[in-house]
Amino acid sequence: MSSSKSFAYQSLLMVLCVTSPLVAFATQLEEVQGWLQKMYHAAHTLNYEGTFVYGQHGRLSSMRIIHQVTPEGEQERLISMDGTGREVIRDGGKVTCYLPDSKAVVVEKSRKLKKFPPEFPMKLDDLKNYYTFSLIGDSRVAGHITQGIEIVPKDPYRYGHQLWVEKKTGLLLKTHLLDEDNKPIEQFVFTQVSFLDQVADEKLVPAMDTKKFTWYEAKDTNDKDDKDEADFNVDWLPGGFKQDMNRMQKMPTGGMPVKHMVYSDGLSSVSVFIEEDVQHDPANLMGGSRMGAINAHGRHLGDYHVTVVGEVPQLTVEKICEAISTKNQ
């Protein structure tokens, strides 16, 4: 081989070595996005009934779920199979929690509460700057073949995820939330699931008699987001985090309105709660706290108390909490 041809050949090899991983990465990212789109579609179009186990903080809870989609929207009923048999019913944008142990019913908007199975975004254009996405092979869950997906954060401010998606329907059947050491700190897995043509109406109503229960309803004190009226600044956020919500709301059990702000990168999120605390109530959280995957950090800010909560590392909630200031500071 002549020197010129040898040089050209070596140059071509260098180009292939450099570009092949990029092509493979782009192809796999597209495959992952395809599975996430299928998963999102399944979550909002399928009728199903099943049993799943949810575990965090060393505790396991068994739940039954019934999910229905109609032209009027989605309906869902969650029944705890442990303890006192608490139930949660979702009907469109409203969530009603039935608590027989305290003889109470709490009504809230669904945007404030975590969903089961968990939801994940369909588009990865922005998220790929902060996470690595890959396929991790097939696995059998509750008798169904699933496609595994791994999501690894690129910085210490978010958790990782492993997902197992049912291949035929796209329903998410199993998840692991992974901490900074790549260890599961929260798990969700179906032990049985059946796909239905339709759901009987009686399966979507609570089994308990609530005539003697006390009803509470969380209400926003304003009808729209008050982003332009905020009196507080958040001077640091992890890359990609943007404000999703900024509202004043009344808690279900009463008391003074609380400012509630939500920040998210599309996958991870944190809530910021700010309330008046002129007397510096000793019951309010000071410093860090953890319950399973959920971390929190609280502190005083003048005549206010600030709490930051989220399924993110403790470092994240602490840095955000310490970065909150009043506009007149």
Tell me what each language-model feature is:
Residues 138-211:
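Gly/Pro-enriched, hydrophobic low-complexity segments
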Residues 2-5, 15, 22-74, 83, ...:
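N-terminal leader/targeting segments and the immediate start of mature chains
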Residues 213-301, 314-315:
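Short, solvent-exposed recognition patches
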Residues 113-157:
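Short N-terminal edge-element motif at the start of the domain
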Residues 45-49, 72-77, 143-150, 171-174, ...:
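Short, hydrophobic/aromatic-rich segments at coil-to-beta transitions
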Residues 60-64, 157-161, 173, 185-186, ...:
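Short, surface-exposed coil-to-beta transition loops
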Residues 62, 66-118, 177-189, 195-197:
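An acidic-aromatic
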